[in-house]
């Protein structure tokens, strides 16, 4: 069953697949294993570096553990994005410009 967040993920995946050159990413499926709070998209872009995207449906924010993981990524020199597809894509576009 599709969830509102899955539609946001689909749109972000389409954008990354079709609109961004020199990019590698994956979408981890933790399923109760691994480190909690890991973002929905983990990737690396040439000349920009490591990034993570936490996808949220409209009106929702990251959980405390997701905020913590995003801070850890930023502290290590990575870039994080969170929100709906529209918000994330706009911020990603500004980052790669």
Task: Enumerate the predicted regions with their spans.
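Catalytic phosphate/metal-binding cores of nucleic-acid and nucleotide-processing enzymes, i.e., regions
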Residues: 1-97
């Amino acid at each position: 069953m599709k969830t509102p967040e899955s539609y946001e993920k689909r749109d972000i995946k389409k954008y990354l697949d079709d609109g961004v050159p020199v990019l590698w990413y994956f979408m981890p499926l933790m399923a109760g294993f691994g480190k909690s709070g890991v973002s929905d998209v983990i990737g690396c872009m040439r000349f920009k570096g490591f990034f993570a995207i936490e996808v949220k449906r409209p009106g929702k924010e990251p959980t405390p553990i997701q905020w913590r993981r995003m801070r850890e990524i930023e502290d290590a020199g990575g870039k994080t994005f969170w929100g709906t597809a529209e918000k994330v894509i706009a911020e990603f576009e500004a980052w790669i410009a």
